[in-house]
UniProtKB/Swiss-Prot annotation:
Annotated keywords: Isomerase, tRNA processing
Enzyme class: isomerase
Organism of provenance: Lactiplantibacillus plantarum (strain ATCC BAA-793 / NCIMB 8826 / WCFS1) (Lactobacillus plantarum)
Keyword set includes tRNA processing: yes
Designated name of the protein: tRNA pseudouridine synthase B
Amino acid sequence: MLNGILPLYKPRGMTSFDCVAKIRRLYQTRKVGHSGTLDPNVDGVLPICIGNATKVVQFLVASGKEYQGSITLGFATTTEDLDGEEIARQAVTEPFTSDQVDAALAQMTGAITQIPPMFSAVKVNGRRLYDYARSGETVERPERHITISSFKQRQASTYDSATQTQTIYFTVACSKGTYVRTLAVDVGKVLGVPAVMSDLTRLKSGGFTLDETVTFEEIAAHVDAGTAGALLAPIDKALSQYPRVTLTDEQWQRVKNGAFITAAEGQQTDPDANTMVALVYQNSLKCLYSYRPDEQRYKPFKMFAVN
């Protein structure tokens, strides 16, 4: 069975689950998972884990994301993007200056909190928020803490005098769990007008960039040629943030049976409860070990291979 991470280009019009289902058919395996939902109207990078790589989905999900897109000022919708029904309109009679836009984006940068939109997959009391929304219900949603590393204009905004709307073009780097739709709405609030996210493309996720992605057409061609495995990145691509420790033969005999390794064997200076190391044997990533300060040693966190 093939194991690895497929840097898929998700086209618009498909859900992330649609993509997983199609990859299962193409690669003829049920062991497939994606690393972070993209809305149907969003395209871009969607890393897909195949085979044993499904064990690293959580690490890909935890990685930061980068997007480019646009925010249109002057109206709001139920879904915070162009798919919803219009619920508010306020003419932008005079376009905001570049400095005003920059200042609004700056207010959204750093450690901030968000309230997930009603049209989202977040669960409250066991139900998806979008299920409440489709029933016409609004429920209290828990705040989430996120980090916006960068939020900038990528080109000059445009103004449509006929509709009295203004469109801002941006790039954003953010932590997991960020709703860019909600960022767009909040930018409008800072500027004093309703707003929607009018376009979005994911540029980076899980260490993969847009120019590294492959399309379904390319995948199908490789499947026909018998070379589909060549499209898969190794599992350790998802774990590049963790320091590597190369094991001796003796250490590997212990580790493959789930034994601990000492603080000295972990080779890290002043490890703490957040310290993890990736253990490598014969150039193959075998597992992740986490440090236990109370025991002053490393214990298994995730095993990838034992042979």
